[in-house]
Amino acid sequence: MIDRKDNNQFHLVSKYEPSGDQPEAIEALVDNIEGGEKAQILKGATGTGKTYTMSQVIQKVNKPTLVIAHNKTLAGQLYGEFKEFFPDNAVEYFVSYYDYYQPEAYVPSSDTYIEKDSSVNDEIDKLRHSATSALLERNDVIVVASVSCIYGLGSPKEYADSVVSLRPSQEISRDQLLNDLVDIQFERNDIDFQRGRFRVRGDVVEIFPASRDEHAFRVEFFGDEIDRIREIESLTGRVLGEVDHLAIFPATHFMTNDEHMEVAIAKIQKEMKEQVRLFEAEGKLIEAQRIRQRTEYDVEMLREMGYTSGVENYSRHMDGRSEGEPPYTLLDFFPEDFLIMIDESHMTMGQIKGMYNGDRSRKEMLVNYGFRLPSALDNRPLRREEFESHVHQIVYVSATPGDYEMEQTDTVIEQIIRPTGLLDPEVEVRPTMGQMDDLLGEINTRADKGERTFITTLTKKMAEDLTDYLKEMGVKVKYMHSDIKTLERTEIIRDLRLGVFDVLIGINLLREGIDVPEVSLVAILDADKEGFLRNERGLIQTIGRAARNSQGHVIMYADTVTQSMRRAIDETHRRRQIQMAYNEEHGIIPQTIKKDIRDLIAITKANDSEVAEEAVDYNAMTKSERQEAIKKLQKQMQEAAELLDFELAAQIRDMVLELKAMD
């Protein structure tokens, strides 16, 4: 039994008060939610404090909230911000727990079967368990998730029904508790005490929940009765206090009881026989033999252990679902009246739409060649329309909402004023004739003032040629393209901010982490070439790169003004006029954002000081030196994760993978 708390209130902690047009945006969003409006858009310009507005709305409507971002890095940033805003509430993080993931696949042309291979991040697995258990225990929960939240997770009812509930004076034998823990996939290990494990010492059972990383619980028996339950430090065993009730959630999200397991196994065997008959009728004897062997092995594991590698492929049978019925996901763990907020919705909704098709084509190949039963096709992400069926109320958040969001609602709430008083940059169009000389002059003007320049081109070749030309002209310039790995990419951004060079050229500079306050000029070459990077949304996003500096300016080099250019320029000008009027009325002088330059590359010294060693050239290292560097980076990654700085942890993880690839 779970003691659910339904009356908790969200409490926002911040030294700031809503300013600019935040109060109006907050009031409008809250009124619409309380008035039963299903969908609305928060159209907020870059740097206007959209996350703070979202937090204010969550506090006022007091509903469990799911915030979806389009990648792990952005989800990590949002998680950190919400954690600061709501220290007294449950702020959870739910993303894919794979550091490395090679999905199961089959390539018929070379007769190559690729077995599923993955590396699970233990810290993220803990946070996923923390998210699901929090949703079942309390109402004041914010879960920040990636699109991983639309993938199959197991039945929330089975998960909740499997909870082992313990109280002092409860009549239960020690051995019964041990059996119950094994049933919910806990592992006994009296030596290595980790998450999802328990250990036994006489009449004392110590349990380490899957959702914790430092605190465990000590259950002390007197005969066949629980004498007391104490919370302890998992490492030292130091007692932290006594508890009146302990709910132990399963160590896996894919739970089923013995009765359901037998029914599921019968269905799996029936489906296997049908598939074998089908293959044999088509003369596919190898496929028939393959599916029989693989399924019989999995069934044996399920009978003996209650689990098998790839158990999720049998989730349709385990959950008792019909063919084609959507899987259970994180969304099913929320109560019916929860709130969804989609961050950067123009990107995220596209991802939600695309996940199903990519997964389906890979699995069909496995089914057709006898590696998986057809029911594996129902272990899948949700289709977009299935996602929509879970939506009670939703807020799309973006500076440039997509067509899909605009079709869902006419309710658009704008947030244009920045708390810093910064204006959207001035945008001008200049002809392509003589553009190189013109651009060179603009770059030198900025460099003399200690400011930086972004240049965006359409092709790799043009970016390379422009880099060579500017170098010949004495400009300190670098070029960033998609082939550059994380190690170099973070180094390049850091060097740009430090002034090691003045100009950064790229094809798509809209990726996360490219917010550089020192950039006062953004030059867009071939601005009149319509396409993905030169459509209205792409141009507005690119213009936004100059919105962090009080001297922000954008030059579009073009011979004609396209419809996309006109709309982007008009929208930027409209915002700028509103911002200028507000600043004048309130006596605000725009200030460039001050942002610390964090060293992501240098390996820190192994002492308590925060002084970093000089950046290291990893290519010049010997193999043993690289191994030592990997150990240091892994330690930093763990420390960053413990401090909940998942953005930094993810970047260090990528560096480690690249260093390993050098050997």
Swiss-Prot record:
It comes from Streptococcus mutans serotype c (strain ATCC 700610 / UA159). Residues 435-601 form the Helicase C-terminal domain. PANTHER family: UVRABC SYSTEM PROTEIN B. One of its GO terms (cellular component) is excinuclease repair complex. Residues 627-662 form the UVR domain. SMART domains: DEXDc, HELICc. A motif (Beta-hairpin) lies at residues 97-120. The UvrABC repair system catalyzes the recognition and processing of DNA lesions. A damage recognition complex composed of 2 UvrA and 2 UvrB subunits scans DNA for abnormalities. Upon binding of the UvrA(2)B(2) complex to a putative damaged site, the DNA wraps around one UvrB monomer. DNA wrap is dependent on ATP binding by UvrB and probably causes local melting of the DNA helix, facilitating insertion of UvrB beta-hairpin between the DNA strands. Then UvrB probes one DNA strand for the presence of a lesion. Keywords: ATP-binding, Cytoplasm, DNA damage, DNA excision, DNA repair, Excision nuclease, Helicase, Hydrolase, Nucleotide-binding, SOS response. Residues 31-188 form the Helicase ATP-binding domain. GO terms for biological process: nucleotide-excision repair; SOS response. The beta-hairpin motif is involved in DNA binding. Forms a heterotetramer with UvrA during the search for lesions. Interacts with UvrC in an incision complex. The keyword rRNA-binding does not apply. It is found in: Cytoplasm. HAMAP family: UvrB (MF_00204). SUPFAM superfamilies: C-terminal UvrC-binding domain of UvrB (SSF46600), P-loop containing nucleoside triphosphate hydrolases (SSF52540). InterPro entries: Helicase/UvrB_N (IPR006935), Helicase_ATP-bd (IPR014001), Helicase_C-like (IPR001650), P-loop_NTPase (IPR027417), UVR_dom (IPR001943), UVR_dom_sf (IPR036876), UvrB (IPR004807), UvrB_inter (IPR041471). ATP binds at G44, A45, T46, G47, T48, G49, K50, T51. The keyword Transport does not apply. One of its GO terms (molecular function) is helicase activity. This is UvrABC system protein B. Belongs to the UvrB family.
